[in-house]
């Protein structure tokens, strides 16, 4: 259950952070209304809160692992919302990042982690 909870929280954090950044991008770079940026700022704040819900107690570990989720999630977001098509190097790089996430978060550790 802890792995499932971590994965769900990482996905939720990615939606909040990537979605928030995308909303700000839409306002600033694509000329959308200012309130798009406001919603983006709220979503980015929500991301910061969601990260605190991870079962692991170590800030550095959580944020380092989330970085890999962010890389892969950003490519998926771009595909869904902007028509971006990643090349094989984008895909290979994101898979490497996700393997890193699994090692950082779920490798067996002693009690002194």
Swiss-Prot record:
Xref: Pfam families: UPF0060 (PF02694)
N-terminal signal peptide: none
Predominant localisation class: membrane
UniProt keyword terms in alphabetical order: Cell membrane, Membrane, Plasmid, Transmembrane, Transmembrane helix
Domain of life per record: Bacteria
Membrane topology: Multi-pass membrane protein
Transmembrane annotation, as ranges: 7-27, 33-53, 62-82, 91-111
Location(s) in or outside the cell: Cell membrane
SUPFAM superfamilies registered for this protein in UniProt: Multidrug resistance efflux transporter EmrE (SSF103481)
Protein name stated in the entry: UPF0060 membrane protein Arth_4423
Species of the source: Arthrobacter sp. (strain FB24)
GO cellular component: plasma membrane
Similarity comment: family membership: Belongs to the UPF0060 family.
């Amino acid at each position: 259950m802890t792995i499932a909870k971590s994965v769900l929280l990482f996905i939720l954090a990615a939606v909040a952070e990537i979605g928030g950044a995308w909303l700000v991008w839409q306002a600033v770079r694509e000329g959308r209304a200012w309130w798009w940026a406001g919603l983006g700022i709220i979503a980015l704040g929500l991301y910061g809160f969601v990260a605190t819900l991870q079962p692991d107690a170590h800030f550095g570990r959580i944020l380092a692992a989330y970085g890999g989720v962010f890389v892969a999630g950003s490519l998926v977001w771009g595909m869904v919302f902007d028509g971006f098509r990643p090349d094989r190097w984008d895909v290979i790089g994101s898979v490497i990042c996700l393997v890193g996430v699994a090692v950082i978060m779920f490798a067996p550790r002693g009690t002194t982690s």
